[in-house]
Amino acid sequence: MEREFVMIKPDGVKRGLVGEIISRIERKGLKIVAMKMLKLDREMAERLYEEHKGKPFFDDLISYVTSGPVVAMVVEGPNAVEVMRRMIGDTDGAKAAPGTIRGDFALSKARNVVHATDSPEKVAREMSIFFRDDEIVEGYELCHSIY
């Protein structure tokens, strides 16, 4: 099974979209194996977005993601990175397809509700910023039976 790091950004939390986003993830068949709400400090935010350091939007991005609470998650499932990237849609909400998280909820390219790691090679690094190994739950199966 592949893992993916997902973070609901401050605009998603402040607008009450956490439950909707989690529901979409679970309905798609991805399993949440770690989750926490926290307020990022500058150091964590800079580590998460280190690939953008030096770009014109970097300081605004860091200010934005440290402006309020976020919900960090690790999800697991077959092709989790690809599945999650398709679910969230284009970085620019105006270009994101309807039905994707960003297509439905993004306010702008900067305030686009959710972050998800863009490649399997980066997942372990991003997960380690937020979670220790012992915080990731192992060994449970999803049961979609209706009672």
From Swiss-Prot:
GO terms for cellular component: cytoplasm
GO molecular function, one term: nucleoside diphosphate kinase activity
UniProt binding sites for ATP: 9, 57, 85, 91, 102, 112
InterPro entries: NDK-like_dom (IPR034907), NDK-like_dom_sf (IPR036850), Nucleoside_diP_kinase (IPR001564)
EC number: 2.7.4.6
UniProt-annotated catalytic positions: 115 (pros-phosphohistidine intermediate)
Catalytic activity: a 2'-deoxyribonucleoside 5'-diphosphate + ATP = a 2'-deoxyribonucleoside 5'-triphosphate + ADP; a ribonucleoside 5'-diphosphate + ATP = a ribonucleoside 5'-triphosphate + ADP
Enzyme class: transferase
Keyword line: ATP-binding, Cytoplasm, Kinase, Magnesium, Metal-binding, Nucleotide metabolism, Nucleotide-binding, Phosphoprotein, Transferase
Superkingdom of this protein's organism: Archaea
Any single GO BP term: GTP biosynthetic process
Cofactor field: Mg(2+)
Subcellular location: Cytoplasm
Signal peptide: none
PANTHER family: NUCLEOSIDE DIPHOSPHATE KINASE
Protein family: Belongs to the NDK family.
NCBIfam families (UniProt xref): PRK00668.1 (NF001908)
Primary role: Major role in the synthesis of nucleoside triphosphates other than ATP. The ATP gamma phosphate is transferred to the NDP beta phosphate via a ping-pong mechanism, using a phosphorylated active-site intermediate.
Descriptive protein name: Nucleoside diphosphate kinase
Organism, scientific name: Ignicoccus hospitalis (strain KIN4/I / DSM 18386 / JCM 14125)
Name of the gene: ndk
